[in-house]
């Protein structure tokens, strides 16, 4: 039986702490789950790694001191304050000048997508750094009927593939990073190469008393973009929040979304000693 003391929790946001079925502006963490996360964060670090941007996350995860935003392009370390959190440090995994230049490319991609009548009903989410640079886009069709998902996935991916191929042509080739998913109903485009493995390393580097092998770190996620972080964490748990989705996850364990709060409560009550038995109790 695996037994491991959890010294820090790192979690994805969308689809993990909030079900994927929820769209932007309605996806707040349920009260009971937020309460246990807040209680845990007073005892061990709870950090977030997300494709969402800083402005979005700051309002949603008040229990987290470290927010790795836009797939790790920007990581913000906060200091607690009686009234509101204050930014202590910003860490960029890309050159700010390159981000500024590529932001215009992302704007052009967004305009191209929205100019097509067949995509007029899709959501295009713009993701900005804390100083206002556009660094990511998500084209999202989760609110459409599942019968239409495969059509939008194929059509959007074809359009983006053509645009990215054109961007790579001389005389001035431009690279953007595209994150695709096997079953999730959206696609992400970023202005710099990024992944949650790099974001994970950045977050852990800001924490104390974490061993170099990351054994004491528990990571929670729900999609393929979490795989690089799953592979680094000592304990990796995939969260199943939407029965329509069948992502290929490189995690050691799984929990249904409805079991997550119970698991975290049991983990805290057990002094943060993780075991297979504890997980099974939460699943019962």
What does each model-found stretch correspond to?
Residues 20, 27-126:
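Active-site phosphate-binding/coordination module
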Residues 5-23, 200, 230:
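Asp-based phosphoryl-transfer active-site loop
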Residues 6, 43-44, 64, 71, ...:
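Short, well-ordered alpha-helix to beta-strand connector turns
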Residues 112-218, 224-232:
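Conserved acidic, metal-coordinating active-site core of Asp-based
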Residues 2-11, 31-44, 166, 215:
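A short, Lys/Arg-enriched amphipathic alpha-helix followed by its capping loop at the start of a domain
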Residues 17-25, 184-191:
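Glycine-rich phosphate-binding "P-loop"
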Residues 4, 190-284:
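Mg2+-dependent phosphoryl-transfer enzymes with acidic/Ser/Thr/Gly-rich catalytic loops
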């Amino acid at each position: 039986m695996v037994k491991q003391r959890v010294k820090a929790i790192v979690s994805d946001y969308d689809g993990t702490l909030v079900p994927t079925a929820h769209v932007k502006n309605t996806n707040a963490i349920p009260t009971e789950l937020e309460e246990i996360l807040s209680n845990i964060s007073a005892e061990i670090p709870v950090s977030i790694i997300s494709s969402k941007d800083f402005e979005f996350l700051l309002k949603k995860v008040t229990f987290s001191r470290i927010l790795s935003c836009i797939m790790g392009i920007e990581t913000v370390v906060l200091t607690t304050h009686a009234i509101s959190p204050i930014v202590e440090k910003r860490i960029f995994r890309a050159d700010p000048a390159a981000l500024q230049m590529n932001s215009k490319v992302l704007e052009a991609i967004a305009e191209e997508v929205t100019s097509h009548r067949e995509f007029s009903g899709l959501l295009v989410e713009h993701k900005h750094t804390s100083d206002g640079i556009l660094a990511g886009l998500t084209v999202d069709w989760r609110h459409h009927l599942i019968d239409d998902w495969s059509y939008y996935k194929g059509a959007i991916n074809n359009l983006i593939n053509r645009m990215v191929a054109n961007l790579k042509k001389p005389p001035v080739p431009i690279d953007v990073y595209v994150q695709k998913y096997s079953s999730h109903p959206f696609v992400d485009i970023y202005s710099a190469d990024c992944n949650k493995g790099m974001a994970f390393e950045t977050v852990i580097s800001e924490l104390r008393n974490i061993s170099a092998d990351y054994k004491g770190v528990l990571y929670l996620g729900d999609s393929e973009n979490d795989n690089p972080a799953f592979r680094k964490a000592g304990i990796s748990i995939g969260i199943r929040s939407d029965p329509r989705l069948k992502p290929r996850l490189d995690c050691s364990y799984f929990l249904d979304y409805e079991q997550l709060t119970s698991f975290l409560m049991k983990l805290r009550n057990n002094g943060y000693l993780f075991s297979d038995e504890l997980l099974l109790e939460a699943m019962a």
